[in-house]
Regions:
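Jelly-roll (double-stranded beta-helix
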Residues: 1-62, 67-88, 96-187
Length: 187
């Protein structure tokens, strides 16, 4: 057998061990492949999010270790989709979602389509009291590293803006980037 000089498989478990320090909060994800027409990320827990992501491309989830809850929001409400260890799930484009990874040491793989010039990703926050949308931000994330670099800035900006965090419907103040309310995630 003649092995290819540059294309080689690698040990995923060792890769996770070598990158364990980057699979922790606040975002807890690490890009696996940079030179591809898809984005392959490894995501670690614990991490619970209080924002909802509006992705213009499909997202494929494979839960390697531990369980997660994928919160989904639409016009009728907020729902939970459990993704258990060993399970996969395909999320269609533009479905508002908030991955909840409350288990320490959980590991998942998320594969997304490549971003192209002009594509925008949205981030929305909903009132925990009445489920009204309190804020939305759209940003171009047309490079794989974009989400890793831009998410902390997006979250910080929202957390520091009292007006953006105040629900126009009921006046409740969203916690910003603080912890989600008790009972938000039940695995």
């Amino acid at each position: 057998m003649i092995e290819h000089p540059s294309l080689k498989a690698f040990n995923f478990k060792k890769w996770v061990e070598d990158n364990a320090d980057q699979l922790k909060p606040p975002v807890g994800n690490k890009l696996m492949h940079k030179d591809a027409d898809m984005i392959v990320m490894v995501v670690g827990g614990p991490n619970t999010r209080v924002d909802f992501h509006d992705d213009p491309v499909n997202e494929w989830f494979y839960q390697v270790k531990g369980d997660i809850i994928l919160k989904i929001a639409d016009q009728k409400g907020i729902y939970d989709i459990p993704i258990r260890e060993g399970e996969v799930f395909m999320l269609p484009p533009h479905v508002l979602h908030a991955p909840q990874r409350p288990q320490v040491g959980s590991i998942g793989i998320v594969v997304e389509g490549a971003r192209h010039a002009g594509m925008l990703e949205g981030f929305e926050w909903f009132c925990f009291n009445c489920q009204t949308k309190v804020h939305r931000v759209e940003v171009p994330l047309d490079v794989p590293e974009g989400i890793v670099d831009k998410l902390p800035q997006i979250f910080e900006s929202f957390a520091n803006d009292i007006d953006a965090r105040t629900c126009e419907n009921c006046g409740t103040l969203h916690p910003g980037k603080g912890p989600a309310p008790e009972g938000w995630v039940n695995i």
